[in-house]
Amino acid sequence: TLSSSSAASDVYKRQIYNFIQWRHLLTSGNQASFYDYQVFLNKNSDYPRISRVKYLAEHKLSTESVSPKKIIKWFGENDPLSGYGKMILGESHILIGDKNKGTKLIKEGWVTADLSKNELKYFRKKYKKYLNADDYIKRADYLAWNGDRWDLQRLIRYLPKDYELLYNARHLLMSKGYGVDQAIANVPQKFKNDAGLNYDRLKWRRKKGRVDSSTEILLKIRNDKEYLVRPDKWWKEREIISRALLYKKKYEISYKISSNHGMTEGSEYAAAEWMSGWIALSFLNDPMTAKDHFKNFYENVSYPISLSRGAYWLGRAYEKTGEIELSNNWYREATKYLTTYYGQLAFLKLNPNGKFELEKDMEIDPKYRIQFFNKELVKISYLLDELKKDKYTKHILRHLANDNIAKGSEVLAAELATSINRYDFAIQVSKIASYQKRFHNKYNYPIISTPKY
């Protein structure tokens, strides 16, 4: 009937409008108002990248255009996602009479807020009463550790004199500017051993290819978390220098630099422990020490690719100490993940001429399949493919993959990606699933026809 076809047409138009609005709201520097964001979020809470939309919505808030009570209500029980949002929420609390809570939020938000040149001037003036020198120093430290050199440069002039000299040196080291030596010489004595300054000096030397003088810094500093401030940042430099020292056959120093990392958790900790174990086993012939490092690595990872790596290298370490039963147990552990490199190496250790099979992919309930393919975002994906705009389906497909994992949404999202010839997105969806030990091998390792030239 005419009315049902016009109703269908209206639904279709609304779906297209939603998608265009979503893309618009995700574009930085757009002209949308906070209310545009609010309307979209109220109607489309099931869209992809909603956290990012909320983050950008916070940057549209202002107590001049939205009442403080409305701002407080909008955040509700949720913490702001941005430093900017924290400041505006803090200002709203002050305006309704809660000065303590408001000031605390402004101070916290100021440290991490993403501010343009004009916004920095504006908020610096606006929050003059609530911010002190300490807040400026904290912001400078945050920006410096994150390598935000342009934002740091804008802030330096507002710092107390001794800190201005310290952060000017850090800024020049970061930006490889002229006058680095003089800037370092100008740093007050009390900051000569500042962790951030040493980190930026190390990075500067390493980028210039100065392995020996980089090593000098790493051997001289204290290696505890308290001193290093961001041991995870230091790790990247340690790893590069440590490998460079292996090429120079300086194995003991290489081990010392990789193992004195000052971390106790996180992905960088796991990387440091694996590398230290590998150096101990392969270059220092010390399987006992290697074992401890590999155990630390194994106990701090969860992805199959890393679990198989840890188990395989534990197998190697126990093999070296002659504990064959323990060695084989660890190899067996690694073979639980046969789609990984180390899982396959471990399988060959136990079955030198053996063949292995992968598990079958999961079956999908036909009812759920129909429900899935009727979703608005699925239809949008097909439309984008027809319009040759399939690059925009990436986040949509990843979002759809989480719809109902138990019923097979990951498989169906990968199938959808394959049907619009985005094998790369199908692989992404399957790879993310594999991190949680769910293997969809048909889509993770697609068989494609040979390209014709």
What is the role of each PLM region?
Residues N42-D46, D79, I94-L115, D141-G147, ...:
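TPR/TPR-like (Sel1-like) alpha-helical repeat modules
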Residues A334-L383, Y445-Y453:
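Extracellular/periplasmic ectodomains of large secreted or surface enzymes and adhesion receptors
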Residues S5-S6, A32-L41, S65-F75, V111-K125, ...:
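Repeat-mediated protein-protein interaction surfaces in helical alpha-solenoids
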Residues T1, K138-Y142, D200, W204, ...:
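Alpha-helical segment of the N-proximal tetratricopeptide repeat
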Residues L2-A8, Y12:
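Single conserved hydrophobic/aromatic residue that forms the stacking wall/gate
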Residues S28, L61, H93, L143, ...:
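Residue at a conserved register position within TPR or TPR-like alpha-solenoid repeats
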Residues K13-F19, Q31-S33, S45-K54, E64-K69, ...:
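Generic helix N-cap/helix-start motif at coil->alpha-helix transitions
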Residues Q15-N18, W22, Y35-D46, A185, ...:
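Catalytic glycan-binding domains that act on GlcNAc-containing polysaccharides
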